[in-house]
Regions:
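N-terminal catalytic or cofactor-binding beta/alpha core of small enzyme domains
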Residues: 1-117, 124-135, 140-147
Length: 147
């Protein structure tokens, strides 16, 4: 099964860039041949071709839960963002709309690994809490890849 890991986020805003940091760390560690990892930042449309080819997509992004604790890692389906809920993407990505732009007849399975941010401020680095949580985030992604 061809799996696509999408690291989303804005690297200029500290923890908002956690998806990008996670994608880069995963690339450094290495992945199975059938896994493609893309650091797409906030340019999800740039991944359209890869999205069309994927059978499974794992999205990694900063999300805010109603009573979330910074550094918490959540696993949720894509449709968790399609209606007002207690969880919100940090930069309002709408992968479900992007999927509709593809020529696919069968949508891929999509899982979101969301990470509760501690700090959203001008910085290229993750906050200490999220930097410490990065191995947990990578492990959550690896579990999805292996599933």
């Amino acid at each position: 099964m061809k799996t696509l890991v999408l690291g989303l986020g804005n690297l200029l805003l500290c923890d908002e860039g956690v998806g990008v940091h996670a994608a880069r760390a995963l690339l450094e560690e290495g992945c199975p041949e059938e896994v493609t990892v893309l650091d797409i930042g906030t340019a999800i449309l740039d991944a359209l071709e890869a999205i069309e080819e994927a059978e499974r997509i794992v999205v990694v992004d900063a999300v805010m839960a109603e009573d979330g604790v910074p550094g918490s890692v959540y696993r949720m389906p894509l449709d968790a963002f399609e209606s007002p809920t207690s969880i919100a993407s940090m930069h309002g990505f709408d992968l479900s709309r992007v999927l509709k732009l593809t020529t696919r007849t069968t949508p891929p399975e999509v899982v979101v690994i969301g990470v509760e941010p501690e700090t959203i401020a001008w910085s290229l680095d993750l906050s200490p809490v999220l930097a410490e949580a990065l191995p947990v985030i990578i492990e959550a992604i690896r579990k999805e890849i292996a599933a």
